[in-house]
Swiss-Prot record:
Keyword annotations from UniProtKB, A to Z: ATP-binding, Cytoplasm, DNA damage, DNA excision, DNA repair, Excision nuclease, Nucleotide-binding, SOS response
Free-text domain note: The beta-hairpin motif is involved in DNA binding.
Binding locations of ATP: 44-51
GO biological process: nucleotide-excision repair; SOS response
Name this protein carries in UniProt: UvrABC system protein B
Gene, per the UniProt record: uvrB
Subunit organization: Forms a heterotetramer with UvrA during the search for lesions. Interacts with UvrC in an incision complex.
Lineage: Bacteria, Pseudomonadati, Pseudomonadota, Betaproteobacteria, Nitrosomonadales
Renumbered ranges of motif Beta-hairpin: 97-120
Chain ranges of the Helicase ATP-binding domain: 31-419
Species this protein is from: Thiobacillus denitrificans (strain ATCC 25259 / T1)
Occurrences of domain Helicase C-terminal (ranges): 435-601
Amino acid sequence: MFVTFPDSPFRLFQPFPPAGDQPTAIARLIEGIDDGLSYQTLLGVTGSGKTYTMANVIARAGRPALIMAPNKTLAAQLYAEMREFFPENAVEYFVSYYDYYQPEAYVPARDLFIEKDSSINEHIEQMRLSATKSLLERRDTVIVCTVSAIYGIGDPSDYHSMILLLRQNDKMTQREVIARLTQMQYDRNDVDFKRGVFRVRGDVIDIFPAEHAETAIRVELFDDVVETLHLFDPLTGQILQKVSRFTVFPSSHYVTPRETTLRAIEAIKVELRERLDWYYANNKLVEAQRLEQRTRFDLEMMVELGFCKGIENYSRHLSGRKAGEPPPTLIDYLAKDALMFIDESHVTVTQVGGMYKGDRSRKENLVDYGFRLPSALDNRPLKFEEFEALMPQTVFVSATPAKYEAEHAGQVVEQLVRPTGLIDPIVEVRPVTTQVDDLMSEVKKRVAVGERVLVTTLTKRMAEDLTDYLAEHGVKVRYLHSDIDTVERVEIIRDLRLGEFDVLVGINLLREGLDIPEVSLVAILDADKEGFLRSERSLIQTIGRAARHLNGTAILYADRITDSMQRAIGETERRRAKQIAFNTEHGITPRGVVKRIKDIIDGVYDADASRQELKAAQTAAEYKVMDEKSLTKRVKKIEKEMQDAAKNLEFEKAAVLRDQLKELKALLFGVEERE
């Protein structure tokens, strides 16, 4: 059932009306927004429907919204849910488009310069462009993003000034259209028609807009007038509909008008002269020669093509900012009255605070040793105080708000009652001495009735040992750790839900934003070791992973009860008591969460393709930093593996190894091998 609200462009799909604490939470948050509160906190327990509450607040407020999540996995989950709540509105996804990213760096101790190397996910790049397009074009927009939103992208005013507006009966020559598309960084290719490409056949120009995944536009000119505009399917060529106007957006966020580029080139030349004078005065001749050679090459590319590799390092000059000013980011594209929701704020807020310094220390080496001009330091993420200054009205969303939210919340809205009547898990404390044997017997009980178990340990070593031990005793177990990429992590969670295995072992499971209704037991080993992984907030988050199951239980293995444990157990008991009282008062019988098992990043990643691209990019980067001796060893090893594969008739494997070998030999000998 769809519902609409006065003066709101959103149509909210409401499968059921708000229940439990949701109606009160929605009303109080809307009241806070109307009263002009800058910050509010939604303290919502696991399984209380925080995402549904957010969707209701967005629909009732009727303003564009930005939802920031701590990682790609959670962002994908939120994006999928928001698309279900707002199927007729613009729900967009803005995360880092790198499947793999090796930033430019210099290691002075080894005199080693590492070139920037990356593997860009085309589909996510298209979604990022679609996100900024929606923000510029419409009010009914919800953007789900990660901390990637605080990194510099092109200036909104430059980006907007480069838009090509096509209207029926407008006067426009074929040459003018082609020139404009070239300025917008579209490539002409009459053979391979893909995103960011146009093709020309006489007076017919086909354009595949960079922000569209499945629609292209055909422009038919007659006597230097736009005669007709048709949307068509780029794969089949089938005409979809005739339109009277169409807006083509630039193919990159870094696109810049020609006059701005020429102005920037002059400013870069001035900075280069000043920097070279400084190097000569300090007798740093190698650095001076290196900087001049690299910068002049970039300037030549910018004069000829309008852009160069690593153009983002000149973003300060291109946007006309002063030294030290913040770069334009996604937040600059937001409307002035937009709303911001920071999901899992206890993690996300600290992430935002940590980005600037890590980026700065890497770039300082590049500047000191003549690889980049000092202005490259201004191609950076926002500092925390700059982010604060740009924040629109904000709602922090967390089950365990941190100190920052407590200090900044105009009001704290609690959502402790679950509409399903589910009660917080029973928390038990058991001795450490017998923790592994006790865990084994608990696991067997749960597996026998088709339930799943999460186990969290303190160290990687212990997680690996425990996984091996459980596997030896016939338990179907997997191990989740930081080396597993986003796509594989999502698949492991999906496999656990499907019953491919029964026990998932990890170190910091709470970070993964796990939403697994099938989990009935969470076991926390060494719960009495005070520290980040066993703080009150971490314990509450981890205990909450069992809160979506009727028989949810959390076992804390400890020889003493620490202050953090005491507070976490006390808070869980308080929430249990409130839910039980609500259930009794309203005659509710708790029922488990039934959630369709689907790939939560459907439409965001092609899992197999992403994994293959990522692996190839990582291997290539690994080869580039190897010395000659290591490369020779690797060549011999791969040659042997290739011959063995061919002997065993594994020809596909042999072909992959052959390609790796060609790449290695090209690196080793500096030439491509001929067939």
